[in-house]
Design a protein with these regions (language model features):
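Non-catalytic, conserved peripheral segments adjacent to functional cores
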Residues: 1-97, 110, 114-150
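Glycine-rich nucleotide phosphate-binding loop and flanking beta-alpha elements
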Residues: 107
Length: 150
């Protein structure tokens, strides 16, 4: 069996005259990509301005699951031993992609809009995460944050 790689899937947005509803994890079956994975901790991170970089950080054991609930962000996940194994995802409140990062990948994000809020799910408690967390220079693998014109 090959090691899991980072991936994203689009979450359905339901909208009516009252507003929007976006299910993040509808049930445990959505976590079947990682047998035994349980979300132990949920938290949010907010960036005040566009262009703020959060990352890179790396976990050997911890899974992370992310979704943007306000604003927009570019996510980057890569294998520090093989940085060419790079995965880039865009998520926003308008098109909420759930981004899943398995252990062994350095990951981070840059806000593309002011007031961006990221909801995070983790397979580790806060205490477990402290011993498994390695911070890295956001430019250790070059400028992977800039949005390029097409």
């Amino acid at each position: 069996m090959s090691e899991p790689k980072p991936f994203a899937y689009e979450s359905k947005v339901s909208s009516d005259d009252r507003g929007v509803f976006v299910p993040w994890l509808k049930d445990a079956h959505e976590l079947e990509f990682a047998p035994g994975l349980a979300i132990k901790r949920i938290y949010y991170v907010a960036n005040y301005g566009a262009g703020v970089i959060r990352g890179f950080h790396f976990h050997r054991k911890e899974w992370k699951v992310f979704i943007i609930c306000c604003g927009a962000a570019k996510f980057v996940a890569l294998d520090p031993q093989h940085p060419e194994d790079r995965h880039t995802f865009i998520s926003s409140a308008r098109k909420p992609n759930v981004v899943v990062v398995p252990p062994g990948y350095a990951n981070g994000w840059v806000s593309l809009e002011p007031e961006t809020i990221l909801i995070c799910g983790s397979s580790s408690s806060f205490e477990e995460s402290l011993g498994d967390d390695e911070r890295m220079d956001p430019y250790a693998f070059g400028d992977v944050w800039t949005v390029t014109g097409r």
